[in-house]
Regions:
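Intrinsically disordered, low-complexity regions enriched in serine/threonine
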Residues: 3-186
Length: 186
């Protein structure tokens, strides 16, 4: 994170993933951290990611990769601003939530509804813009704890996602969904 940006509501960040068996590579992904809910968003591959294989001068390549990812931070801010300025009509909000549920649960039973994952957890997310809808859906899907019904009709609460791989995949997918909706509604 850049000095001086940490005092804001949110800040771009570099997400560093490592394959712990040493056979693959480091991955550096552009992300966005939101202080109010402690959510980290993973920006889609459209903004770029850097892979550094576990061979050769790794330290130098990781540093170069970090600078490359930092180079897209302004584009992340532009996307966020564009999402905040796009007011979503209710059918578009529902479509985004439906796409998120389909990604998460497939065609299986969905324990919660689109209305459930569109319900904000805090007042900062009560906006009608794309950014607010995206943030609300992302937090509800990742943190879980939403009341719902199992396939047998039993009362349940959705589970939080603790797996790094699942978190990254869902985060990327949600970013791509929001970005695609943004482009289609411009």
């Amino acid at each position: 994170r850049r000095a001086g940006e940490i005092n804001g509501e949110h800040v771009p960040e570099i997400i560093l993933l490592n394959s712990h068996d040493g056979t693959s590579s480091y991955q550096m992904l552009p992300g966005y951290f939101r202080f109010v809910c402690q959510n980290g968003c993973v920006c889609g591959q459209s903004l770029g990611e850097v892979r550094v294989p576990h061979r050769g001068n790794v330290v130098e390549k990781v540093i170069e990769g970090a600078y490359e990812v930092v180079g897209v931070f302004d584009r992340i801010e532009e996307k966020r601003d564009a999402m905040q300025s796009l007011i979503l009509p209710p059918p578009a909000r529902q479509a985004l939530a439906q796409a998120a549920l389909t990604y998460r649960y497939g065609d299986e039973h969905r324990p919660v509804t689109t209305a459930d994952i569109l319900t904000p957890r805090r007042r900062e997310d009560y906006g009608k813009d794309l950014w607010s809808a995206y943030q609300t859906i992302q937090e509800n899907m990742l943190k879980g704890g939403i009341s719902g019904r199992s396939a047998r009709g039993k009362r349940i609460h959705t589970r939080a996602i603790h797996s790094i791989d699942t978190d990254i995949k869902l985060n990327r997918a949600l970013w791509v969904m929001a970005e695609t909706l943004l482009e289609s509604m411009r």
